[in-house]
């Protein structure tokens, strides 16, 4: 099979943690001559983001059940069946050689549709604990990969595909050696922000004073409130932005990151070679805790669960990290990363397609 003949359908949606790694693999294979289409939902971020990346997208109607009422749960089998039929019709038209499930609700009916048509299914689990959809699909998949050890007992650990501009950053030894002055603290709560960070970090800044300079991403609608909180704490000099468009530049600026531990965030921080103080989102399966644990075990990060994320604990932790410690942690972070994750996932997809 030549590169010109290969066809891939990527199934991913809902959040950047699913969509961005899928885009990285898609572009890598498109550069090798693959035809790529995307299966997503019309009301989530992939609907805009995927076409902007030059990839055609097909939509099915599916959403999650968590937090829904009894009526929605009773209707779930009908909705899943309808989504499966939609996905099956789309795949019959496109005839992919392989489908790649990167997570999100769309992967469930999409993976079942591919399997019912004899199209091999490849899965990539971004998180340290497998989601329900991927647990089901793993039973029918030809290949299962995981970003962090432990999500599946026997799956290959391949890392998370991250953006090329993050991978292109200078290594910690080049970037951090010779820095002096206040420790540069990057605070990132994700695109939606994180209330615990927005409420706690201005008080941390007051405790640490001139020892730190902070760049704080507040999330949508939070900039003015967080700026006022820093000013009220006597720390108006710190930079607060609603979003950070160029995360690679922010990582290059930082000495340490204080953030949630979503899968893609953890992988990007490791690839950038940065120490981190993680405050995992409190989810019932502790997904973000398991994402962050490998970097803590590597000596590259510290985890403070949300009840422990107090002004005193955060200030004490940051104050204990001098520049020598931060450089050592940064090098450990980079050493724990898998910078060729995109290539590893793409190679497995190619191998499954060639084995048909």
UniProtKB/Swiss-Prot annotation:
What keywords tag this UniProt record? Answer: Cell cycle, Cell division, Cell inner membrane, Cell membrane, Cell shape, Cell wall biogenesis/degradation, Glycosyltransferase, Membrane, Peptidoglycan synthesis, Transferase
- According to the UniProt record, what class of enzyme is this? transferase
Does the record's keyword annotation contain Cytoplasm? no
| Biological process annotations from GO | carbohydrate metabolic process; cell division; cell wall organization; lipid glycosylation; peptidoglycan biosynthetic process; regulation of cell shape
Which InterPro entries does its entry note?
GlcNAc_MurG, Glyco_trans_28_C, GlycoTrans_28_N
Keyword flag Glycoprotein: no
User: Binding of UDP-N-acetyl-alpha-D-glucosamine: at which residues?
Assistant: 15-17, 127, 163, 191, 244, 263-268, 288
- Write down the membrane topology: Peripheral membrane protein
Provide the GO MF annotations for this entry. Answer: UDP-N-acetyl-D-glucosamine:N-acetylmuramoyl-L-alanyl-D-glutamyl-meso-2,6-diaminopimelyl-D-alanyl-D-alanine-diphosphoundecaprenol 4-beta-N-acetylglucosaminlytransferase activity; undecaprenyldiphospho-muramoylpentapeptide beta-N-acetylglucosaminyltransferase activity
Pathway, per UniProt? Cell wall biogenesis; peptidoglycan biosynthesis
Q: Which reaction does it catalyse?
A: di-trans,octa-cis-undecaprenyl diphospho-N-acetyl-alpha-D-muramoyl-L-alanyl-D-glutamyl-meso-2,6-diaminopimeloyl-D-alanyl-D-alanine + UDP-N-acetyl-alpha-D-glucosamine = di-trans,octa-cis-undecaprenyl diphospho-[N-acetyl-alpha-D-glucosaminyl-(1->4)]-N-acetyl-alpha-D-muramoyl-L-alanyl-D-glutamyl-meso-2,6-diaminopimeloyl-D-alanyl-D-alanine + UDP + H(+)
Q: Where in the cell is it found?
A: Cell inner membrane
GO cellular component assignments: plasma membrane
The EC number(s) given in the record are 2.4.1.227
Could you tell me what this protein does? Cell wall formation. Catalyzes the transfer of a GlcNAc subunit on undecaprenyl-pyrophosphoryl-MurNAc-pentapeptide (lipid intermediate I) to form undecaprenyl-pyrophosphoryl-MurNAc-(pentapeptide)GlcNAc (lipid intermediate II).
Give the protein family: Belongs to the glycosyltransferase 28 family. MurG subfamily.
Name the chain's protein: UDP-N-acetylglucosamine--N-acetylmuramyl-(pentapeptide) pyrophosphoryl-undecaprenol N-acetylglucosamine transferase
Q: Which organism does this record belong to?
A: Klebsiella pneumoniae (strain 342)
């Amino acid at each position: 099979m030549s590169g010109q003949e290969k066809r891939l359908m990527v199934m991913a949606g809902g959040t950047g943690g699913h969509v961005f790694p899928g885009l990285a693999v898609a572009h890598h294979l498109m550069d090798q001559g693959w035809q790529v289409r995307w299966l997503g939902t019309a009301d989530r971020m992939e609907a805009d983001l995927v076409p902007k990346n030059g990839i055609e997208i097909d939509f099915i109607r599916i959403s999650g059940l968590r937090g829904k009422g009894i009526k929605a749960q009773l209707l779930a089998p009908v909705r899943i069946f309808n989504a499966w039929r939609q996905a099956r019709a789309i795949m019959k038209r496109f005839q992919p050689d392989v489908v790649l499930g990167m997570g999100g609700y769309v992967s469930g009916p999409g993976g079942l549709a591919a399997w019912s048509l004899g199209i091999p299914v490849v899965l990539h689990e971004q998180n340290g604990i497998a989601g329900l959809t991927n647990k089901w699909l793993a039973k029918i998949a030809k290949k299962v990969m995981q970003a962090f050890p432990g999500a599946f007992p026997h799956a290959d650990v391949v890392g998370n595909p991250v953006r090329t501009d993050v991978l292109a950053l200078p290594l910690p030894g080049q970037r951090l050696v010779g820095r002096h002055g206040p420790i540069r603290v990057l605070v990132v709560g994700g695109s939606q922000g994180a209330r615990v960070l927005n409420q706690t970090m201005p008080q941390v800044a007051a405790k640490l004073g001139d020892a730190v300079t902070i760049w704080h991403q507040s999330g949508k609608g939070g900039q003015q409130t967080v700026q006022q909180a820093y000013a009220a704490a006597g720390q108006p000099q710190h930079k607060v932005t609603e979003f950070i468009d160029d995360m690679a530049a922010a990582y290059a600026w930082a000495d340490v990151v204080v953030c949630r531990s979503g899968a893609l965030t953890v992988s990007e921080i490791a690839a950038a070679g940065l120490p981190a103080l993680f405050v995992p989102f409190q989810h019932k399966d502790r997904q973000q805790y398991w994402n962050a644990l490998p970097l803590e075990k590597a000596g590259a990060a510290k985890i403070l669960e949300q009840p422990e994320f107090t002004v005193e604990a955060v200030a004490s932790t940051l104050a204990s990290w001098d520049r020598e410690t931060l450089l050592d942690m940064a090098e450990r972070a980079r050493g724990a990363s898998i910078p060729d994750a995109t290539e590893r996932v793409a190679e497995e997809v190619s191998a499954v397609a060639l084995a048909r």
